[in-house]
Amino acid sequence: MAFTEIANLISSKNFKAILDYCQRQEIESKNIDLIKSYYGVYLLSYLINNDLINAKHLWKRIPNDFKQSNQQLKNIYTIIKSISQTNPTITYTSLSINIGDDYTPFITTLKENFQQRTFELISNAYSSITVNDCSSYLGISPEDTIKFTTSKCWEHDKASNTLKPVPIQKQSSELPTGNQQIRSLTSYVLFLEKST
């Protein structure tokens, strides 16, 4: 594994701690090569933590010559752009690009998180959705979509091949901050606008 300093955090899937580590390195480290080696991890950690805005800001801070010469960073930026476009099909396609074995835990977790967030948005935004539309939003086959959604208590109407979502009640022990509320509302509105 290339990221020896954070290997334990990666194996425990503690992506918040990985993000904190990368932020500290960017601020405190004098070793520019170390910082450059972590840019991909840093960008993906922002995305895993659902912080697209800071991922975009980090992209702007990365030196242009390094961005242009590093194919892995270019591929990660493709993921950032696809998430920004709020088109799940494009996002799943960009997540299937092989960035390298060292990034596999990040890509796997990001895909799972993206799929879960999309599922929650569908659950709360739709009263009915076709299996094919839901399948493209979740990035899985229609058969797997039916299995997955019915396991979450959705109803499947075989005659019309539609699904009836069950709204998800978020259980939060703390109140969201203003930024979290704005981000959540923005995601919801963008998702609804994209689907019309």
UniProtKB/Swiss-Prot annotation:
InterPro entries cross-referenced by the UniProt entry: COP9_CSN8, CSN8_PSD8_EIF3K, PCI_dom
Gene3D superfamilies: 1.25.40.990
Domain PCI stretches: 10-177
Subcellular location: Cytoplasm; Nucleus
Annotated GO CC locations: COP9 signalosome; cytoplasm
Example GO BP: protein deneddylation
Pfam family, one: CSN8_PSD8_EIF3K
Main location: cytoplasm
Domain of life: Eukaryota
Keyword S-adenosyl-L-methionine: no
UniProt entry keywords in alphabetical sequence: Cytoplasm, Nucleus, Signalosome
Oligomer and partners: Component of the CSN complex. The holocomplex is comprised of 8 subunits csn1-8. In the complex, it probably interacts directly with csn5 and csn8.
Family the entry assigns: Belongs to the CSN8 family.
Annotated function: Component of the COP9 signalosome complex (CSN), a complex involved in various cellular and developmental processes. The CSN complex is an essential regulator of the ubiquitin (Ubl) conjugation pathway by mediating the deneddylation of the cullin subunits of E3 ligase complexes, leading to modify the Ubl ligase activity.
Protein name: COP9 signalosome complex subunit 8
Organism (species): Dictyostelium discoideum (Social amoeba)
Gene this protein is translated from: csn8
